[in-house]
Structure formats: C-alpha cells, structure tokens
C-alpha cells in the first residue's frame, strides 16, 4: 500500500474487481484487494485475516483516506429495527447455513467500523448487497435500509461502490438490493438523510472486541 501511494482501498471478490475497475479506470488513487472463495480455511484466511490485515494497514497509512468493503446483507449480530421477525429469522438462517463465511465477514466489517470510527476524517464504507446476479445492470436500486432478502446485479453493486467512493465524508453500512429508485437519486438521498444500516448494532462492543492499532 505504501508503494502504490493509494488513497482508497476496495476489498471485493471475484468479478467485482473487473466491474469496479472499468468504472474507475481513469483514476490512479485506489487499490483493490480480492476476497476469497473456497473452503473454511481459505475463507478465514482471505475474507477475515487478510482483509483485517489490509484494514489495519490502510488505517496506519499516511495516504489512504477511504476503505470500502463488499460485505453481505445478513452480516450483522442483531436484528435491524426495520426488519420483522420473519425477515430476521431468514437472515439468521442464511448465516447458519454459511457460518464460516458469516463470521469472517462480520469480523472484517466490525474491525473496519470500530477502527474507522476512531480515525478522524477516515471514510469507511461497508456495502452490503443481497443475493448477486450476473444480469445486466439495471440502474434502479433499493438502498440504505432494505428488506432482509432480495437480489441485485453485480453491475449495480459496482456502480454504487464507485458513487460512494466519489463522495466525501462517507462513513457507515449501506444495504443494497435491486429496486425502483434511480441509482444516483438513491445514493444522494441516503447520504443526505444520514441513513446508516449499522443502526441497532453495538458500536461500543465492537470497539471493545477489536484490538487498537
């Protein structure tokens, strides 16, 4: 990271790297890290350990000002206030079916959040899409606080990621599904209204669980 003199870090997986790259090809101030696929050991090594290493390195860097991680909609400890019991049960079921992935993602999300909150002026972005499709980008989304289950195209996720990075002073968790609102309008609305889907999570507990820099 020091060698590249990057200002932003994007931690993503698979085809997101290429999709985000296409949208940011004119910029030279960012670095993309790849998320992991495979068995539990690889998931922990990449989605948890390597990601946390990059988070800590980014926050210790003198040049990096933003870190965006592509997480998952169900990656949270507590029920979102805008979800009903059925929605929360559905999210928990997803996490129980993929426990290693869930725990790895949550550890990375909470590390970025806890440490990002403690560094003044640092932009931390936890982008949390639902189920992913390879369909053509739609350009219409549900963003900020969404229902607990749904689909979104990878292209739409990449587009939202770029729009968030291009804004100043963005911090927080942002849920994302396909929807009916134009992408530009949705992003502007959520940032203007200060919507953060971390609401309901225990930030102080995160800070206690995460070792300081």
Question: What is the predicted function of each stretch?
Answer:
Residues 1-61, 165-168:
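NAD(P)H-binding glycine-rich loop region in Rossmannoid oxidoreductase-like domains
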Residues 16-17, 61-66, 71-213:
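Oxidoreductase cofactor-interface core, primarily capturing Rossmann-like NAD(P)-dependent enzymes
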């Amino acid at each position: 990271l020091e060698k590249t003199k990057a200002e932003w870090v994007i931690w993503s997986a698979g085809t997101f790297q290429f999709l985000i790259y296409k949208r940011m090809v004119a910029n030279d101030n960012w670095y993309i890290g790849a998320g992991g696929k495979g068995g539990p050991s690889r998931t922990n090594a990449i989605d948890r350990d390597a990601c946390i290493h990059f988070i800590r390195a980014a926050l210790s860097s003198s040049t990096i000002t933003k870190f965006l991680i592509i997480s998952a909609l169900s990656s949270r400890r507590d029920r979102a206030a805008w979800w009903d019991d059925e929605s929360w049960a559905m999210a928990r079921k997803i996490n129980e079916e993929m426990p290693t992935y869930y725990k790895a993602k949550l550890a990375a999300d909470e590390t970025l959040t806890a440490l990002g909150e403690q560094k003044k002026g640092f932009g931390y972005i936890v982008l949390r899409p639902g189920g992913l499709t390879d369909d053509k980008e739609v350009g219409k989304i549900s963003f900020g606080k969404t229902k607990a289950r749904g689909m979104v195209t990878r292209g739409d996720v990449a587009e939202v990621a770029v729009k968030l990075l291009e804004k100043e002073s963005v911090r927080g968790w942002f849920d994302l599904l396909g929807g009916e609102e134009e992408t530009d309008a949705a992003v502007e609305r959520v940032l203007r209204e200060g919507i953060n889907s971390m609401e309901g999570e225990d930030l102080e507990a995160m800070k206690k669980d995460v070792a300081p820099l």
